[in-house]
A protein has these predicted regions:
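Conserved beta-strand-loop-alpha-helix junction that forms the acyl-donor binding cleft
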Residues: 128-138, 155-159
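Residues forming the Rossmann-fold NAD(P)(H) cofactor-binding site
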Residues: 108
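Acetyl-CoA-dependent GNAT
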Residues: 3-21, 26-100, 111-113, 117, ...
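Conserved acetyl-CoA-binding loop of GNAT-fold acetyltransferases
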Residues: 142-150
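Conserved GNAT acetyl-CoA-binding A-motif
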Residues: 118-129
Length: 173
């Protein structure tokens, strides 16, 4: 079990609810490049669906749809699956920082704090996927130590599955 209050030293982290939908939508809209690559626009309906969407084999209690708050302002959103696709792996379904904070290193600091806590919680690796056609995502996740390990087709285009090991003795796959 994750201790979400330990995921950041600078931000208050809590589970997001439907009451947060408007703030989440505003944060998503501040990242138009991401949605341009998806070929869609963010919507309240999509956000509500994302709050409960699970990969095959994951249980609702494995999902953490979290917000990072600076005061009352939502600064970042994290969709994390505990123990997917294996018990020792955490899966990041979405990590998005308010576009107004872009380029300030906030996202990288939040990711590093997240990875530290996941390692403390016993995870040996973190997986995620991003669009191959999105150079911004490629630069960001590579800069944060994630290595692409495979390509997968997706309705939004080819996705790169990437892994970051939290223990040096593990194989990245």
């Amino acid at each position: 079990m994750l201790h979400i209050e330990r995921l950041s030293r600078a931000y208050r982290v809590r589970r997001l609810t439907e009451e947060d939908t408007a703030q989440i939508l505003a944060l998503c809209r501040s990242n138009p490049l991401y949605y341009r690559h998806c070929g869609t626009e963010p919507s309240e309906a999509d956000i509500r669906q994302d709050m409960t969407l699970l990969p095959p084999g994951a249980a609702p209690e494995d999902k953490y749809f979290l917000g990072y708050f600076h005061g009352d302002r939502l600064a970042a959103v994290l969709d994390l699956i505990d123990g997917y696709p294996s018990a020792e792996t955490a899966y990041i379904g979405l990590f998005m920082v308010d576009g107004r904070f872009s380029g300030q290193g906030i996202g990288s600091r939040l990711v590093e704090e997240l990875l530290e806590e996941l390692k403390t919680a016993g995870f040996s690796r973190v997986r995620l996927a991003y669009q191959k056609a999105n150079p911004q995502s490629t630069r960001y996740w590579t800069k944060n130590g994630f290595q692409p390990v495979e390509e997968k087709p997706h309705p939004y285009g080819t996705m790169l599955v990437a892994v970051r090991n939290l223990s040096f003795s593990e194989n990245p796959c």
